[in-house]
């Protein structure tokens, strides 16, 4: 319980206003900021395994929805496991409408905060299930909801960058509509995933996987460091004929040969394709997050994929 006690103490300190405990990756994302629905069909999850990063837990839920059955969630944020189990217990315990009311910041209007967000009443409906699923996750959130106002928890432990309701639904197959949500509800008790807290760049990872999702890590590191990570994963963790989501890039509808010098390195596509030429075997333009919002089909976002032979 040593690591758990440390995580809870830090979370409580942040809620109390001791912001010196806030680290670079200490905030959770309530939902994915990627259009997972736009790229998940490029991967085979039918009874396959997945290693993924992502503090929102949505990579885990969408992969399980698509057939994955052996999932490892690897993330630098120590609260990631607790939040993933909170979502799973909510899916088991709450209706589609209740889930939306509990987790979404905006429901009816992007200018009016949802007053039921992190409702103690809705938490009480799911907390017995959470206790059964993962006792540490139950203790973590039960303590926080007992001590702090819901708005304090949401504003201080979670990133404030949450999109509109229609975008979140569009990015997640399991939230697309009530039928999809209920389909996941009917099978989610079978979900098992392993959580590992650590820095994927520096840590040794146990196991071999059919699929690996690196999410948007490519936007927060150098191309050379990303190349080293891909080499490590390819040699030690990726099965033959396995696939890696190397990176997710937003708003890539510009001419990739004409970019601004001050953009992040990975967006300089001629350089990226050269440095990662041994790994980028496919790239796909997909319906972007902004496209979902404006109901357009510009395919503004880009995914980079590696297929191992």
Predicted regions and their residues:
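Class I S-adenosyl-L-methionine-dependent methyltransferase module
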Residues: 2-11, 79-187
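S-adenosyl-L-methionine
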Residues: 2-46
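Conserved class I S-adenosyl-L-methionine
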Residues: 47-56, 71-72
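A short acidic, Gly/Pro-enriched loop at the edge of an enzyme's catalytic core
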Residues: 201-213
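Conserved beta-strand signature within the Rossmann-like core of class I S-adenosyl-L-methionine
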Residues: 213, 240-253
